[in-house]
């Protein structure tokens, strides 16, 4: 399968383990299970393990106890990043005609419990989500996609980090047209984007003069809805609107896994000539 072949390619020359025996369940099997589990809506490590233990144990005879599976999966976070990069390159998402950038919240706990929460205490912060018109405590994901909906990159910061400051991490490897919302308006940020070869297009605020033609503004508004769809899928199907992880290691694995699974779904749709973001239809195709 693709995972097995790509896994061998991206890990060529890399020694994943310095000692001990090879695991009974192969690393490529673990990643395959994670991706399938995520697409089916089983977003947590335990839920994915339980699903395959209950329904597909004969297909994965090496599947052992839950803690072993969770630890092995978390240790493969870097490999999953390399696999995601492989998909991005394969579909030409970095060199696409245009990209869209936006952020969304990842709650660590309910706002009322924030003072007592010890989960990701050094990384979390208080933030405001304009789309939901609510304050929250946790993290913020800054997502970049191409115009088809392929997730090119993501970076996660504390909720109180300005999205313009975080955007540099995901914009550094692309050029051309980038669509953003009003939150990305800042003269210095605009100038930095131009220096990187990026044409940043955003709506204007009420006190700003608009010189672009109306048809262009309507087109930008319509195209920007693509990232709203992707974020909605990540929040609902992949449950990325909150996290139950207690450390950066497992958080990194969780975010990477969900992004990889989503991108794999889009990749499959593109290969089948289907609507890229129709993940529901992919499951019954």
Which residues does each predicted region cover?
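Short alpha-helical elements
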Residues: 1-285
């Amino acid at each position: 399968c693709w995972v097995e072949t790509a896994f061998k390619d991206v890990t060529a020359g890399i020694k994943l383990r310095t000692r001990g025996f090879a695991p009974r369940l192969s690393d490529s099997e673990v990643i395959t299970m994670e991706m399938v589990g995520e697409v089916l809506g089983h977003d947590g490590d335990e839920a994915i393990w339980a699903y395959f233990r209950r329904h597909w144990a004969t297909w994965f005879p090496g599947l052992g106890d839950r803690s072993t599976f969770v630890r092995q999966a978390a240790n493969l976070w870097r490999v999953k990043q390399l696999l995601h990069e492989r998909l991005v390159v394969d579909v030409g998402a970095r060199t696409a005609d245009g990209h869209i950038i936006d952020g969304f919240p990842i709650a660590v706990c309910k706002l009322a419990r924030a003072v007592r929460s010890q989960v990701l205490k050094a990384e979390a912060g208080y933030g405001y989500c304009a789309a939901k018109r609510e304050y929250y405590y946790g993290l913020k994901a800054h997502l970049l996609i191409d115009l088809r909906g392929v997730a090119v990159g993501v970076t996660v910061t504390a909720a109180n980090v300005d999205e313009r400051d975080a955007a540099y991490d995901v914009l550094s490897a692309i050029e051309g047209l980038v669509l953003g919302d009003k939150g990305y308006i800042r003269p210095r940020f605009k100038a930095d984007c131009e220096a990187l070869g990026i044409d940043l297009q955003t709506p204007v605020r009420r006190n700003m003069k608009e010189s672009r033609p109306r048809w262009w503004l309507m087109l930008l508004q319509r195209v920007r809805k693509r990232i709203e769809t992707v974020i909605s899928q990540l929040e609902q199907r992949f449950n990325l609107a909150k996290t139950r992880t207690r450390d950066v290691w497992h958080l990194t694995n969780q975010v990477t896994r969900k992004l990889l699974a989503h991108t794999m779904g889009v990749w499959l749709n593109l290969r089948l000539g289907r609507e890229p973001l129709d993940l529901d239809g992919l499951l019954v195709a």
